């Protein structure tokens, strides 16, 4: 069957193993063709092609439910659920999303983007099914990295106490998350995966049974359970963790052997309670470069299929904020042995892979465990260490209670570096870093800041480490501004003090973080239109520099705030509340992300859609204050502050 003709997963029913293997070949070809052109997640999807086909041949996707954890491995799923023709629009504005979205397809049974949620969601569907007296199957597909997440373990604990609820968990064990997984559970899975006795027993049972004359060289599906029982008798540790938690354990099995997986899944569906099928796969399967470098090819920008190398970008770019952070932290760690970098399975993305290589004794990876990471850091701070937790803004949301309860209330000196803060682009709404400003505003004792460029990032990191309390620093995705960097001798900033970058009497612009350079360009455009603006680099969200902002707001009489974050409870709201509390009641216009989700697109396309480019902001400001009809406001008296 041609992949282009496969528009419904139920078309897999009745295909022979050879035909399924041919479909698998076509999926890999299309997967590589599109991702090499437009970029996207590569290794995860290549690793689950056979798993997807084998599982779907045993299900009726018009009725049964499958929840893919995270969703970045679901490109094969998308290719066989009616999106083959549009797949070349992957992760592009208005095109196929890089993750699962319920609004995109009826076969995307649960949306995701963050790890470890699949078992809870699929179990919830099973509970609803039982209450309604229905009979559809519920399946969660989760990776070994995501299985270390607390919510996944909580769900397994719950499911194990529902012995009469049919429910299948497929453990996609590729010994990777984005980076290699860590922890005791991962070590246990690794022992199971590579256990020589397990492989010997499995192979011996199958070969002996197949050799019986009346078997015809085939192994009945029902004997898979017998194989599992024999393995557990001979090697008690295999599957013991899951068996003790109430699951029937089956595996480990080869995740690229379609025939064996089909038999195993058919058997698993017949078990009357929770079942875990342990499938061992190779991340990046079928593309040698991705198999050899599973971290580097987890996700890729456009690349050359023949050489595997990324296509050259246009022009030389400054180093990314993540790289500047990582290199600066290395030097600070070398100067102070009490500084420790912590990541939650995102070393490469946050720049901490540099620290891991340079100063490994001052580096910790806790796995996909954001809540634990925050409280671990709190405990370390209690004993005099200086933990620096580098984490994506969107993932830190998962540890909001720990930020309050374990760090904020106790006023502990923990530094949080929130990478990918603001608009991130093609990963879409699950990954936009638009909420951290709002949620950090509400936590007492925190000092919160954002740099205007990479040099200010260096100074802010030093400021955080010298501060005797919790501090949070947000940095955007992508390259810096290209300003000169200092190798050492960074001076800390005065806490809660901003700076004036340019002066004008018509308008006050107060910008935060990545929006400061955009504010300066906007001010230039306004000046060309006859409107002269003062621009403040706020630097700090908590505490806000009221001593700088309030007098200028009173004198100038028009205030614009700029942020790349949610307007609801955001930086602009903080400025407005501060002015209002001191009876500085001047017209104010807040620019940021409105109360909406930001869908997948390039960062530039997202900013254009939100009206956040300098040209758009200049036009919006003039329209809001009715300035575009006035050739110049220079010399005019500013509006007086209102009184109550």
UniProtKB/Swiss-Prot annotation:
Catalyzes the acyloin condensation reaction between C atoms 2 and 3 of pyruvate and glyceraldehyde 3-phosphate to yield 1-deoxy-D-xylulose-5-phosphate (DXP). HAMAP family: DXP_synth. CDD domains: TPP_DXS, TPP_PYR_DXS_TK_like. Its cofactor is Mg(2+); thiamine diphosphate. GO terms for cellular component: cytosol. This is 1-deoxy-D-xylulose-5-phosphate synthase. The keyword Metal-binding applies. InterPro entries: Dxylulose-5-P_synthase, THDP-binding, Transketo_C/PFOR_II, Transketolase-like_Pyr-bd, Transketolase_BS, Transketolase_C, Transketolase_CS. Thiamine diphosphate binds at residues 72, 113-115, 145-146, 174, 287, 370. SMART domains: Transket_pyr. Homodimer. One of its GO terms (molecular function) is magnesium ion binding. The keyword Cytoplasm does not apply. Pathway: Metabolic intermediate biosynthesis; 1-deoxy-D-xylulose 5-phosphate biosynthesis; 1-deoxy-D-xylulose 5-phosphate from D-glyceraldehyde 3-phosphate and pyruvate: step 1/1. Belongs to the transketolase family. DXPS subfamily. It catalyses: D-glyceraldehyde 3-phosphate + pyruvate + H(+) = 1-deoxy-D-xylulose 5-phosphate + CO2.
């Amino acid at each position: 069957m041609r992949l282009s003709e496969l528009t419904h997963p139920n078309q897999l029913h009745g295909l022979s193993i050879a035909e399924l293997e041919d479909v698998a070949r076509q999926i890999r070809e299309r997967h590589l063709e599109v991702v090499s052109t437009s970029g996207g997640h590569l290794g995860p999807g290549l690793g689950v092609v056979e798993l997807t086909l084998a599982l779907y041949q045993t299900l009726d996707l018009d009725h049964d439910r499958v929840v893919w954890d995270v969703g970045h491995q679901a490109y094969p799923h998308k290719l066989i659920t009616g999106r083959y023709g549009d797949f070349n629009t992957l992760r592009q504005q208005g095109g196929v999303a890089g993750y699962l979205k319920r609004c995109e397809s009826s076969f995307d049974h649960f949306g995701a983007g963050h790890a470890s949620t699949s078992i809870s969601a699929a179990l919830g569907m099973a509970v609803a099914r039982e209450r309604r007296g229905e009979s559809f199957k519920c399946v969660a597909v989760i990776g070994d990295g995501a299985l270390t997440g607390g919510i996944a373990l909580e769900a397994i604990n719950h499911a194990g106490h529902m012995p009469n609820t049919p429910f299948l968990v497929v453990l996609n064990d590729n010994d990777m998350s984005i980076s290699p997984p860590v922890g005791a559970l991962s070590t246990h899975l690794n022992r199971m995966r590579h256990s020589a006795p397990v492989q010997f027993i499995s192979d011996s049972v199958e070969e002996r049974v197949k050799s019986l004359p009346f078997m015809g060289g085939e192994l009945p599906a029902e004997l898979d359970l017998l194989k599992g029982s024999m393995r557990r008798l001979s090697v008690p540790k295999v599957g013991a963790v899951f068996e003790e938690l109430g699951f029937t354990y089956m595996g480990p099995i080869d995740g690229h052997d379609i025939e064996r997986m089909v038999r195993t899944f058919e058997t698993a569906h017949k078990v009357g309670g929770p079942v875990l099928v342990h499938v061992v796969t190779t991340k990046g399967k079928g593309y040698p470069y991705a198999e050899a470098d599973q971290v580097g090819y987890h996700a890729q920008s456009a690349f050359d299929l023949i050489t595997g190398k990324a296509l050259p970008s246009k022009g030389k770019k400054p180093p990314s904020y993540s790289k500047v952070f990582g290199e600066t932290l290395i030097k600070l760690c070398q100067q102070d042995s009490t500084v420790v970098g912590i990541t939650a399975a995102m070393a490469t993305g946050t720049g901490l892979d540099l620290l891991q290589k340079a100063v490994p004794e001052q580096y910790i990876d806790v796995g996909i465990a954001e809540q634990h990471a925050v409280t671990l850091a709190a405990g370390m701070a209690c004993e005099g260490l200086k933990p620096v937790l580098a984490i994506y803004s969107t993932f830190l949301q998962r540890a909001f209670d720990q930020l309050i309860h374990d760090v904020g209330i106790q006023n502990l000196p923990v530094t949080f570096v929130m990478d990918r803060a603001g608009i991130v682009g093609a990963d879409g709404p699950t990954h936009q870093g638009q909420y951290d400003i709002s949620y950090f505003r509400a936590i007492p004792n925190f000092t919160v800041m954002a740099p205007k460029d990479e040099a200010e990032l260096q100074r802010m990191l030093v400021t955080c480490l010298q501060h005797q309390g919790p501090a949070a620093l947000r940095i955007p995705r992508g390259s810096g501004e290209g300003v000169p960097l200092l190798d050492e001798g960074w001076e800390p900033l005065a806490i809660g003090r901003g700076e004036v970058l340019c002066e004008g009497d018509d308008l006050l612009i107060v910008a935060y973080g990545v929006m400061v350079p955009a504010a300066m360009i906007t001010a230039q455009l306004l000046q060309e239109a006859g409107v002269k603006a003062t621009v403040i680099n706020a630097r700090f969200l908590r505490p806000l520099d009221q001593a700088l902002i309030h007098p200028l707001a009173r004198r100038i009489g028009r205030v614009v705030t700029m942020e790349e974050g949610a307007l609801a409870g955001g930086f602009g709201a903080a400025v407005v509340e501060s002015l209002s509390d001191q009876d500085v009641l001047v017209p104010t216009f807040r620019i940021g992300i409105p109360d909406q989700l930001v869908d997948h697109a390039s960062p530039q396309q997202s900013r254009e859609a939100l009206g956040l480019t300098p040209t758009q902001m200049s036009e919006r400001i003039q329209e809001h204050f009715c300035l575009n009809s006035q050739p110049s406001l220079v010399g005019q008296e500013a509006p007086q502050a209102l009184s109550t």
